[in-house]
Amino acid sequence: MEDFVRQCFNPMIVELAEKAMKEYGEDPKIETNKFAAICTHLEVCFMYSDFHFIDERGESIIVESGDPNALLKHRFEIIEGRDRTMAWTVVNSICNTTGVEKPKFLPDLYDYKENRFIEIGVTRREVHIYYLEKANKIKSEKTHIHIFSFTGEEMATKADYTLDEESRARIKTRLFTIRQEMASRGLWDSFRQSERGEETVEERFEITGTMRRLADQSLPPNFSSLENFRAYVDGFEPNGCIEGKLSQMSKEVNAKIEPFLKTTPRPLRLPDGPPCSQRSKFLLMDALKLSIEDPSHEGEGIPLYDAIKCMKTFFGWKEPNIIKPHERGINPNYLLAWKQVLAELQDIENEEKIPKTKNMKKTSQLKWALGENMAPEKVDFEDCKDVSDLKQYDSDEPETRSLASWIQSEFNKACELTDSSWIELDEIGEDIAPIEHIASIRRNYFTAEVSHCRATEYIMKGVDINTALLNASCAAMDDFQLIPMISKCRTKEGRRKTNLYGFIIKGRSHLRNDTDVVNFVSMEFSLTDPRLEPHKWEKYCVLEIGDMLLRTAIGQVSRPMFLYVRTNGTSKIKMKWGMEMRRCLLQSLQQIESMIEAESSVKEKDMTKEFFENKSETWPIGESPKGVEEGSIGKVCRTLLAKSVFNSLYASPQLEGFSAESRKLLLIVQALRDNLEPGTFDLGGLYEAIEECLINDPWVLLNASWFNSFLTHALK
């Protein structure tokens, strides 16, 4: 039956049916008759609505293949097949705009011509029996019922069949075809008998032969046969006392459930050690841009041309010198690498025609910085499998680091507004269905709140840098290619602007596997003096390369300009995710949407406008040592976005582990706040699992300290 369903129905319908069954915890592979019934019902709903439109005069017309540009509105809104939240949003929206009474159960369609909801039924039994069951269930005069059967009969409220003869004939023919196809495969009888009122029955299949022997062997201890295990499972009352249940299951388990009280949880222990250091792939709050407005030079849009143009806007270059060496590196090599970049950029300008890409000379300083010839030689396993003491290198445990204040400052900065817009508002066509309309209104409000946010700049910077690096890694595998770090934005006045943050030089990049590493050296401009927080810049060698005149309230001041240089590495899979950082916008938009949905369901109307336009209302943003921080809806949007962006910029196994394990503790604490009297066993084990992820990662340590603030305030 399952194969038949997948062959017989459109893949979109099959996918919707699977989703619907999963939502109710049912398995399409087991309850195959139900699977077929849901697909059939979905298809009938779609056929009911197909080709029916309302024209400019408000008349109902049928268009099978006409002028696609005609201003037509679909006559029916399809509610069936959407997930529950979205379906109710559509229903609420229709009720608000048309004044129709809100149904108690989710209907299948809404008819804009007759202004009524429609409940569609497809039955394998007598139509009038099924009609009465439906009518009894929904108990509403307002919802119109229309029942079809597989034998070509139909029945509708007050014998009003809504559609024309021909449209209904199409549906009946399709149902008849499905029945014949099932019959020819010997599936029809089981399908016909499985309908029981509004429910279907599951068949219980017998297990025989090898499978039966395997089942008997794999029973839990103390069960003699599959039958008595089944009987035990069927009689298992899930909401009894947990200790009793555990001891029933196995003699070995003696879990003592401890009540979880306000005094139970302790704060997470954050590690000691030197302060943690910056580990992002590019500078964040400390980055400095050399920019050109309204770029119109020859070759505009070609990164190398843009970079040279940006470099020419700055006149304060001076002889570079090292002001913060890298602890373990050969610092003169970093200095030589920057001098080489300047020299080779100068060479380009002296050429007749500027090339589109620039491959650096393979000098000793670049070979050193890019780890050329440093990888240990690979030996075939066949050649060394007889070595008696073959073992993996002992690797040192990572040194623990303590939380430093810079990471909170980085996060605060990411939530702030810049004076440029980093994403364009999508130009969206006219919406036809109410749900599209709500979605695009929400998207526009959200975009307005975050388009100028610094986190959005990081997204676009990350997308551009990763795209350029992945392209170069594939196109110029053996070359040390010079890759400008560029982003684009618009000023307040709407003028285009191109920004240069610095340069990357990539090493050899024969990336066969997703996790193969390409080394690169990054050189980034900054006005931040590294001596103020030297621990943050442990992995960098910092040069002073110029003086920049800045306009301030007291007139022009000259500031030293620095270059932050470090060796770094990334992989195909990391670059692929970096290129997809725009997903962070979607993730935070969905979080905001769920807040709006919650408000809307309380008020029983769509609250989008009020949500974004009521400037006086404040919303909880997060926990700090001072208590629950609150802010405007725009601040909430930007904070959620910044969290999502930092999860991407600082992605790591430590973060994965911390998020998964701390969530368990969070749920227990929330249960306590909701007076659900939670109980736990092995709480110490959970703390251990959380704390083993707190090693040295700045973003994880910051999240752990936020978690501690949350614990303090949640348990007051």
Swiss-Prot record:
Cofactor binding, per record: Binds 2 manganese ions per subunit.
Protein EC: 3.1.-.-
Binding positions (Mn(2+) 1): 41, 108, 119-120
Residues at which Mn(2+) 2 binds: 80, 108
Motif Nuclear localization signal 2 (NLS2) mapped to chain: 184-247
Primary residence: host cell
Function: Plays an essential role in viral RNA transcription and replication by forming the heterotrimeric polymerase complex together with PB1 and PB2 subunits. The complex transcribes viral mRNAs by using a unique mechanism called cap-snatching. It consists in the hijacking and cleavage of host capped pre-mRNAs. These short capped RNAs are then used as primers for viral mRNAs. The PB2 subunit is responsible for the binding of the 5' cap of cellular pre-mRNAs which are subsequently cleaved after 10-13 nucleotides by the PA subunit that carries the endonuclease activity.
Protein name as it appears in the record: Polymerase acidic protein
Organism: Influenza A virus (strain A/Duck/Hokkaido/8/1980 H3N8)
Gene name of the record: PA
